[in-house]
Swiss-Prot record, chain B:
The keyword Transmembrane applies. HAMAP family: NDH1_NuoH (MF_01350). The chain crosses the membrane at residues 29-51, 98-120, 130-152, 165-187, 202-224, 254-276, 305-327, 340-362. One of its GO terms (molecular function) is quinone binding. Pfam families: NADHdh. Belongs to the complex I subunit 1 family. This is NAD(P)H-quinone oxidoreductase subunit 1. Keywords: Membrane, NAD, NADP, Plastoquinone, Quinone, Thylakoid, Translocase, Transmembrane, Transmembrane helix. The lineage of its organism: Bacteria, Bacillati, Cyanobacteriota, Cyanophyceae, Synechococcales. It is a multi-pass membrane protein. GO terms for cellular component: plasma membrane-derived thylakoid membrane. It comes from the Bacteria.
Amino acid sequence: TKIETRTEPMVLNMGPHHPSMHGVLRLIVTLDGEDVVDCEPVIGYLHRGMEKIAESRTNIMYVPYVSRWDYAAGMFNEAITVNAPEKLADIEVPKRAQYIRVIMLELNRIANHLLWLGPFMADVGAQTPFFYIFREREMIYDLWEAASGMRLINNNYFRVGGVAVDLPYGWNDKCEDFCDYFLPKVDEYEKLITNNPIFRRRVEGVGTVTREEAINWGLSGPMLRGSGVKWDLRKVDHYECYDELDWEVQYETAGDCFARYLVRIREMRESVKIIRQALKAMPGGPYENLEAKRLQEGKKSEWNDFQYQYIAKKVAPTFKIPAGEHYVRLESGKGELGIFIQGNDDVFPWRWKIRSADFNNLQILPHILKGVKVADIMAILGSIDIIMGSVDR
Amino acid sequence: MTSGIDLQNSFLQSLQGFGLPPGLAKLFWIPLPSILMIIGATVGVLVVVWLERKISAAAQQRIGPEYAGPLGVLQPVADGIKLVFKEDVVPAKADPWLFTLGPVLVVLPVFLSYLIVPFGQNLVITDINVGIFLWIALSSIAPIGLLMSGYASNNKYSLLGGLRAAAQSISYEIPLSLAVLAIVMMSNSLSTIDIVDQQSGYGILGWNIWRQPVGFLIFWIAALAECERLPFDLPEAEEELVAGYQTEYAGMKFALFYLGSYVNLVLSALVFSVLYLGGWDFPIPLENVANWLGVAPTTSWLQVLMAALGITMTVLKSYFLIFIAILLRWTVPRVRIDQLLNLGWKFLLPVALANLLITAALKLTFPMAFGG
C-alpha cells in the first residue's frame, strides 16, 4: 500500500495588521503547506462613507475632501470631482486651465506609479527602491506645494471650470527641471530592477491575467494594459487636451506582474513626455505676467481671451448641479476612476457614486491567487496597485 | 613554519614564575580564552550591526544613526540595552519551555563554533583535528532551535517561518559541506590551522580562492542561506510572514535571535576567510621578506608584528565579506521558497558534487598544486 501524508489545510489570517497589506486589507488565506488553496479578501476597514458625505456638500466644500479616497493620487480625485458637474452642466474649461490640469494629472500619475513601485519592490523583498522613489516623489510634492500650497493630499486645486489659482512665477521652469532630473532616475530604477534575475524570477509568469479575463473582470489601467488591451481613457474619451499632445498608450501582452511593472515604468516616461509638451504648448505662455498684460492692454487685450484664463468662472457657493444624471470617468494612475452623478437642481448632488479603479481591480485577486505560493500573494497584490482609502472609500 | 607567539605557554610560565603550581596556573588559564571569545564575538556583532545600519543608510541615501556616540557607533549598544530592559512576553497558549529553549539553542552553537576560528598560528582556542567539521556539525543544531521556537509560539506565521528555516538549513548544509570537503581534500586535514598553513607561503597566490573558483561561490551562497540573509531570508520574510519564527518574541529572547544571526554572519565570514582567503595570511609572503631582509623568524618584535598583522588580516578579510553581504542584502529582492529549494537541490548540490570530483581528479593529476 502507498504511504501518504495527509495535511490539513491551514487557514491563515493576513491583515488588516500585516506589514505588506497595503493599508487595511484583510485576506483570509487557506494554505496547503506553502501553496495557496483559496483566498477571501475582506474589505471595509477604511470605509468613511465618502459617497454619502458628497450628498451633503457643495462641490467647493467637497473638493478638499476627496484626496482621501486614493491618498496617493489626490489630483485625480479632485479632477473627477470637478469633471462630474462640469460635464453634467456643460461648463467649458479654458485651454490654459486644461493644460495646467493635464500637467498636474501627469505629475500625479508619476507620483502614483512611484508610490506603487516602492512598495511593490518591498513586497518582493527589495527595500532600497522605496527610498529612491520617495526622493523623486518629494520633488513632485514640491511642485504641488508651490502651485497649491499642499503636498500629498488636500491640494484643493481643481475647481469647476478650471483650477483654483494660476501657476506661480517660474513654476514651469521648475517643472521642466524636474522632467530633466526624473528621466535619468527612471533609467536608474530600470538598471537596478528590470534585469535583476531574482526579480525577474519572482514576477515573470506570476499572477497572469489573460486578455479575456482582464476584460471580463472589468479591469482597467495598467492591469488591463498589461494584459494586452490597448485601452486608455485619455485616448478613448479625449478629455482635457490630451488629443493635442503626442504620446503613446503603453501596453504589454504577457499579463503577468512583470508586464504590469513594464507598463507602469513606461507610463512614467510617457507622462514626462506629456508634461514637457504641455509646458511648451500652454496658452498664455509659462510666465504669469498675464495679469499685468491684461491691465496694461485694457479690456480688448488678447490675453483677456477666454482660452488664456486659468478658470472659466469662479464657482459661486450657490452653483447648482442641474437635474440629470451622468457617468464621468478619467484615466487615473490605477485605471478608470469614474463618478456617477445625479443632480437635482440643487447645490448638493443627489447621488454621487464613485467607481474607483483599484476596487474593481482588486476583485480578480482571489481568482489569480489560486495555486500560487505564499510569497506570490504579496507580489500579485503589489502588482495590482491598491490604496485601501480608495477601495473602501 | 614558525610557531609564532604561544600565549598559553607564556601565560602559564609567568604564573608559575609567581610560584603557582602548574595545575592551578592551568585553572586560571582555562576561562580566559572563552571569555575573550565571547567578548570578541559580541563586539564583532556590535560592529556589524552598526555597519549594517550605516551601509544600508548610505545605499538608501539616508544618514543612519548619528546621535548615539560619534557617527552613531553606540547605537547597537543602545539597542541592546533597550532589549535587555524590555518585558519578556510569552504569548498565551505558547509552550513556555520550548519558547525559551528555542533562542538558546540557536545562539549557543554559534558561539561554540568560535572555538575553531584561528586568528594566528597559536591564536585559536582549540586546534582540534575535526575543526571545520565541528563547525558544520554545530551549525546544524540551530535549525532545531528555530523549528522549536516557531512551533512553540502558537502562531501560524511563526510555524511557517520555523518550517522554512528547517527546510532551508537542511538544503543548504549539503552543498556547504561538499564545498568544505573539497578544501579539506586539498589540505589533507580538517583542522583550521592546517587549512591556513597549507595556503600560506605564496602570499595571495596561494589562497584557496584560486584553486576553488566554483567552490567558494557555492560556499558563499550556501553560507548566506545558512545565515538567513537576503536574498535568502525567507524564514523571517517580513512581507510574507511578518517576522517568521521571531514574530512572538520580545526583549532578551528576541535579542538572542538577533545576536545569533549576526554572530553567525561574522562566523561565516571568518570561516570563509579561513577556508578561501588564507586566514591570517598576509597577501605578500612576509616570512620570505623577513628572511630576505635577514631578520630571524624568532625575533620577538617580528613575532608580535606578525601576530598583530595576522589578527588584522583575518578581521579585515571577514569584514570585507560582511560588507559584501550587507550590500547584497540592501540590493537584491528575495527568492521564493520553491526557487530557493530548487537552487539548493537541483543546482548547488550537483555543482558542488562535480566540484568535489574535479578537485579529487586534479589532486591526483597535479599533486603539487592541489595538495597531493
